[in-house]
Amino acid sequence: MAFSVSPSVIVREVDASASVPAIATPPAAIAGVFRWGPVGEAILLSSENELVNRYGSPDDTNYETFFTAADYLSYSNALYVARVDNGATHADTYTRVTANNVTTTTDTSGAFKGLYPGELGNSLEVAYVRSEAYEGVIVEMGEDGTSNIPTNKITGNTDLTHTIAFNSANVSFEVSKANKLPIADIDIDDVFVIGNNSVGYQNIPVASIAEVARNAGGTVETDDALIAAYSYDITFNGKYTLPETSLNKLKIDRKWAWSGLFAKKPQDGNYHIAVIDQDGSVSGTADSVLELYTDVSTTTSAKLSSGKTNYYKDIITQESAWVQVANTAHFEANTSTSSYESLAGATAGRTESDATLADLAGGYDLFKSANEIDVSFVLQGKGDSAGNLATYIISNVADYRKDCIAFISPASSDVVDESKTEKMLSNVIDYRNSLPSSSYSVIDSGYKYRYDRYNDVYRYTPLNGDVAGLASRVEPYESPAGFRKGVIKNVVKLAFNPNKAQRDQLYSNEVNPVMSQVGQGIVLFGDKTGLGQNSAFDRINVRRLFIAVEKSIANAAQSFLFELNDEFTQAQFKGIVEPFLRDIQGRRGIVDFRVISDATVNTPAVIDQGKFRANIFIKPARSINNIELTFVATRSGVEFEEIVGSLT
């Protein structure tokens, strides 16, 4: 407190409102192989749709990892996902087919590359056009009045012959020196709009442009420059299907293939950009539009009226989920033609079955520090038969942090690939025995059979995402198992459905059985941790209760750092902890408790060392694992009071 010599009013404020924060369930975490998304970065997701949008839909290379994450998100709404580095590469080369002096070429140095590594990048096309190349009239024919256009072909004046064979995909242009068509302005995938007001108009995309070494008179052209610039055939992706009738006028316009997605052409010098899913691997539908960027500028200082940048590179860097700018000079050089760059060169890398322990460990290490990311559960996803990944997660993440639980499933080869339940049982027990004993782990009995709507197939996927999801739906001091709270979602059947004798064996080895029962569904039928000894911490609810209580009280205790260790501080600490524990007791999570933080533990020696000590004793509530029902038949004349209490 400040002192004053002369008369004055000193204001002092004391905060006596400190309390222990309420118990909350932090997000879960998983690392694994995904088809798309950032590598080596933990992203918080809240739904399966976000999972698909950020990391792509599953395929045969990663469905176990994907559905572990998706299944957890069907119970909860907070999951950190980390994509591991499995050796996948970016789509950083391009197939850009252009009509440059009527030669079809391939350009492997394009303006864009895939934003993330992975084969999905090969499905992307980036189409862009500057205002000058957005649209234009190719030719108008039949206007000179010399003759009508016959039904089998369309012919212009003597300097230009443009032939369309009805119901054919081939169109032939023949051009002499006197009438030069701007071939340099035409690009593969541009759209020709052919027709007139009488018969209507038809859009036909350009498929290829090839050189024709002749002029309008039918003689061979010897001037290479003229051949290259003005003599060509065009083939379309589609047939000319307008009415087969004589026409006295026909107009052909060229336009950018994706012009229909924009209200108008870009302002002078600006560009429209479209990111397209060419083969449907991203969206499920070929040629789906993923992203549009309207009227963007190549000027680095360009701004919109709102003050937001209009520089194309900055916009794509900030907003695109699919591409990044790789070569600004290449992009800005395309001023007079439209461009369609098909991304290529990406590789998928190692699958979830081939991923090394080093690959996966690198992802799970992102969750190793309790000070950086707060998580409650760590999901294993796909397991390996040797238990190496599970051991790493238990030992180096869960046991290391001591504030989260690892959820583990056996390998698919232990149950899915076996036909006899006796062998499945021994495999699962052997798998569990290969893992370390820890109260920070929970082990289930296997795999479930579920529907994969993304590929229209049924697949076996691990149950650790479901078991963790069940735990996320109950209070930390409650068991997630049983017919009320332990019903598994999104399941057709189990790979291993243990009977009573097999469940006894599994439970004796700290494996929580998941079983199917007629009329009840498929349920989690155990709530043990992976601790291989008799202890209060061999139950999920007790371990979770202590994690929650320890984290909450530890967070509250931070405010006492650098305070004076006297009776007032000791009583104040007890005063904020006891109401917190009393609230949990009132909700049936604790049977009894006691907090000791007085001079009996804060001795002068402890105080002189700059320490503060508090002992917190807790009697946790226990879940029911066995129910014994005794039915007693008595004689008619016997009073119940005579025998009640005599039975044990």
Question: What are these regions, as identified by a protein language model?
Answer:
Residues 237-252, 279-299:
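Acidic, small/polar residue-enriched beta-strand/turn segments
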Residues 287-322:
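E2/UBC-UEV (E2-variant) core
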